[in-house]
Amino acid sequence: MFAPGHITGFFVICKSSNKLKTGSIGAGITIDRGVNVELKEGNGSIFYNNKKVNICAVEKVIEHYKKFGYNDDYDIIFSSDFPLGSGLGMSGGCALILAKKLNEMLNLNENYAEIAHISEVECGTGLGDVIAQYVKGFVIRKTPGFPINVEKIVVDDDYYIIIEIFGKKETKEIITNDIWIKKINEYGERCLNELLKNPTLENFVNLSYEFAVNTGLINEKILSICEDLKFTVGASQSMLGNTLFCISKKETLEDALSILKNPIVCNIYY
């Protein structure tokens, strides 16, 4: 079972006393690399790329399904192209596919995406990834949480998404800080309004760059590389992580790859 990675270009933090309606609005793209899950007989351990880990959102999902008879007779094994904390939605992806898996395993008819979203919100590890990963594609989230209200934009399949990961960033430290929230929401709303007027991939990546720079969230090294990649469709930083993403057409792909040290090439995942 697979969940795609999710690149968030920009977002607005939306808080509510109702966890289902807490989340974010904004825009992002899902990619064809992400995370897979399998369950094996065991003692309830969680593994991510062969390393025993604690993933808060995953633990919340497990807690929920224990009410319906799930027990710790299984180890949960996630495998991914990306590390946790890189701004590519891996925490949300793990929660989403595990909720789907347990829903099927226990023959339940629950809205597993809602369970995963609430788990992420409670842990402070994400606000909108689960919704985008559930819907898939180039997704503009118009209202936070559930019920889902998005605009899916169809784009040509001749775009490549190039990623380079430069390290981790703690989502919770930013989305719970009032100074960051004010900056993020001011520029996020502007970018969302502009994208809705002209919902193209080119406009998305340019607005993502503006958001990253204006909020001050962009890493200096990534900023410098974005300047070098201006011959492509555009480049920015995936929110919230120290990960560069670049959108390129085929004719500029090789030149773009030559600038990066450890590039990962993806396609948009629908």
From Swiss-Prot:
InterPro entries: GHMP_kinase_N_dom, PoK, Ribosomal_Su5_D2-typ_SF, Ribsml_uS5_D2-typ_fold_subgr. Transmembrane segments: none annotated. Its EC number is 2.7.1.169. The keyword Nucleotide-binding applies. It catalyses: (R)-pantoate + ATP = (R)-4-phosphopantoate + ADP + H(+). It holds the Pfam family GHMP_kinases_N. Keywords: ATP-binding, Coenzyme A biosynthesis, Kinase, Nucleotide-binding, Transferase. The keyword rRNA processing does not apply. SUPFAM superfamilies: Ribosomal protein S5 domain 2-like. It comes from the Archaea. GO terms for biological process: coenzyme A biosynthetic process. GO terms for molecular function: ATP binding; kinase activity. It is an enzyme of class 2 (transferase). Pathway: Cofactor biosynthesis; coenzyme A biosynthesis. Belongs to the GHMP kinase family. PoK subfamily. Phosphorylates (R)-pantoate to form (R)-4-phosphopantoate in the CoA biosynthesis pathway. This is Pantoate kinase.
